[in-house]
């Protein structure tokens, strides 16, 4: 027995599904179709009679305690069974096969344990109590009862009435807080149902389902647990609600299993070949008529569970094989794309190499042209500079020849004065002298002609002799002039100039030069 406190989000625990789900998510599975439209009065009485008159509910379990919230409104009755998605046109209920011969009395309906209301509406989530009966002690179609006061919104999957035609034998004991009855028959065919909360995550993840495992609920005829991810957003919950209207699973329409409604009621029992073969293999007798005994029902449930496990395992292997095939195709496509990309890379590398080679060739050609143009420009500038230097040398050479000619003539003329200069400053008194040179008209012409005529070594020797003679004559004249006394006076007075005549021979020509020396001695008193 599980009790959920009010005020928190109601979480329903389903022993068959082994999963947690929000109440708002499970509410989308039910609709507001009146239960009276699905069952007539006699069928409703049969359902309530079997529910209330079951000896295991009255003997084994004590009175169920329901903790109700006084502020919560009356809940609505919700019935849920596993064969609502079967191929049969009418909705199947686990209690429609029950006959009116079952024990049904007013005392069973007047107990304080059961409270029903004709108009049940729930607005706030409150306490939920769920009771499940073990299979070993119950008949094959004994339901598990869930009492809850949670707010429920219905879907077209399972017909649950919000307005129930209640028989006269039913008493309304607590009009304020009434429990919600959830019928969950523990039939083996519950495994055939599709839960939208299971379908949505598997389709979202696109992963192969795992085969059902041997869980504790399997031994009781329940569905093997399948864990599903809780919805992370309202979009996923809406998708789960839409998936509830899908077609039933291949297991529910499998020809290997007998339809659930054929196992109800009375009459001959027609089992499938797979069920008969499995029963014989397990060593159980094959039942041929209804209703089934407890041993036959237990054996049939076990066999049907094995067949369903086999079918689900085959389906799982098939989906896994499809998934692996898709993965192999993806690997093949990826490998082919990888090889194509490698080929493209190789082509691009070869193209890059050729382009680099062409670039190097172009660079070499450009550098060769540049060096040739630079060499040509260098040779042109060098030629121009050489021409300029040559012209300058020619001009400068002609100018220096003229200067040499005049300098040689001046040296020959002024040479005696160089020897007389130190003699004139030898005296202790201040002296001023003045050298006057008188040349005849033909002196320059003779000097020029003598410079041109000197070509051989003999002429140079003759000139050297004449020069030495002239120097000796000049020295004698200087000695004679120094021996002459000077006159001392305050005013400048000039004596008669002393004239010396000497003859110098240049070549075969005689040149007469008159050198007049004026000496004036100024004496300061």
Curated annotation (Swiss-Prot):
InterPro entries reported in the protein's UniProt record: bZIP (IPR004827), bZIP_sf (IPR046347)
Family (UniProt): Belongs to the bZIP family. ATF subfamily.
Sequence ranges of Basic and acidic residues compositional bias: 322-332
SUPFAM superfamilies: Leucine zipper domain (SSF57959)
Encoding gene per record: creb3l2
Residue interval(s) of motif S1P recognition: 433-436
Region (Basic motif): 301-330
Protein name: Cyclic AMP-responsive element-binding protein 3-like protein 2
Region (Disordered): 85-104, 203-267, 309-338
UniProt keyword list: Activator, Developmental protein, DNA-binding, Endoplasmic reticulum, Glycoprotein, Membrane, Nucleus, Signal-anchor, Transcription, Transcription regulation, Transmembrane, Transmembrane helix, Unfolded protein response
Main location: endoplasmic reticulum
Complexes and interactors: Binds DNA as a dimer.
GO cellular component: endoplasmic reticulum; endoplasmic reticulum membrane; nucleus
Species of provenance: Xenopus laevis
Lineage: Eukaryota, Metazoa, Chordata, Craniata, Vertebrata
UniProt topology in membrane: Single-pass type II membrane protein
Boundaries of every bZIP domain copy: 299-362
Post-translational modification: Upon ER stress, translocated to the Golgi apparatus, where it is processed by regulated intramembrane proteolysis (RIP) to release the cytosol-facing N-terminal transcription factor domain. The cleavage is performed sequentially by site-1 and site-2 proteases (S1P/mbtps1 and S2P/mbtps2).
GO biological process, one term: regulation of transcription by RNA polymerase II
